[in-house]
Amino acid sequence: MASGGRADDERRIAVAMDYSASSKRALDWAIANLLRRGDHLVVLHVLHHGGEEAKHALWGKSGSPLIPLSEFRDPTAMQQYGVHCDAEVLDMLDTAARQLELTVVAKLYWGDAREKLCDAVEEQKIDTLVMGSRGLGSIQRILLGSVTNYVLSNASCPVTVVKGK
């Protein structure tokens, strides 16, 4: 057994998901190139605080409870979290879960995506994080900061960045 009571071959792979084209490419890449039979896939969402103060107060730094794929598929259930799931992403998750016998869960956080993604890696004991790159130019990256650059520098696990086509 590995630390934390996990089997040595049990992997926890996370994909940062905001439903943008780049995050969908990251999910597609993880399914095609990284995930293998029996893995745990954690879909990480980070939402801004706006309008979610009650949920933020309830779950604070630790985020939402783990949301199983069956609940993640239910639009009514996901509305309570302020997430509107994308049919393409749900189809990708359903297919991967079935074909690779994955355990798929979602986890929501509220706040700064840079910090929350790094927190999630620690809290969820993620082995590898996959995320998309929006492809900001160098000036935009300097002015706005880059979630990707921050996570690459601060996450405690390997991070794979999937660039756009």
List PLM regions with ranges.
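Gly/Ser-rich helix-loop-strand patches that form or flank binding pockets
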Residues: 1-5, 22, 33, 119-165
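Small/aliphatic-rich secondary-structure junction motif
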Residues: 2-75, 83, 94-98, 102-105
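Short, surface-exposed alpha-helical segments at coil->helix boundaries
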Residues: 79, 83-91
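Charged docking surfaces used in two-component/phosphorelay signaling
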Residues: 108-116
